[in-house]
Amino acid sequence: MEWENQLIQELQWSNKISNKASKELVAQEIAGLAKDGDVIGAGSGSTVYLTLFALAQRVKQESLHIEIIPASAEISMTCIQLGLPQTTLWNKRPDWTFDGADEVDPHNNLIKGRGGAMFKEKLLIKSSGKTYIIVDESKLVSKLGSKYPCLLYTSPSPRDRTR
């Protein structure tokens, strides 16, 4: 019996992608960094989503063998849709990671992470040999916090030690 998952086949980005042309150019550049055998950490967000399409194109055209460690379920489902092999931080360490930033100031300080994938994105970045933070002109601000608040998160495990 053959079973098809229509959810994966019909997967698309949930919102309109702003600055799509700029993000696609950056996505092509990041995808161009992949080498055969690379284990690549993939953050979350629309630019990461577009970069996966560019990576999938290289995999198909060049018979490139890579593995992706996704930071979110959405990025994992995109990898499935595109036929990109996945692994986990439990099994492998990423050679490099790419992710987007939410805001970047004139001194190259940035806010990274406003969503549910924030903790795993941080784990990918810390465990990678190299990290590429993807930014288009829409992310440039004069002062951090101009567009979005800076989020804080806590891990519930050591909370009794912080009281």
State the predicted function of each range.
Residues 103-108, 140-151:
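Acidic/polar active-site rim loop that often engages polyanionic ligands
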Residues 2-99:
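N-terminal active-site beta-alpha-beta segment that forms phosphate/nucleotide-binding
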Residues 153-163:
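Single conserved hydrophobic/aromatic residue that forms the stacking wall/gate
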Residues 45, 111, 136:
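Residue-level signal for inorganic ion chemistry
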Residues 89-125:
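Glycine-rich phosphate-binding loop
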Residues 97, 101, 131-133, 151:
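Short, well-ordered beta-strand core segments
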Residues 81, 126-128:
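Alpha-helix C-terminal capping segments
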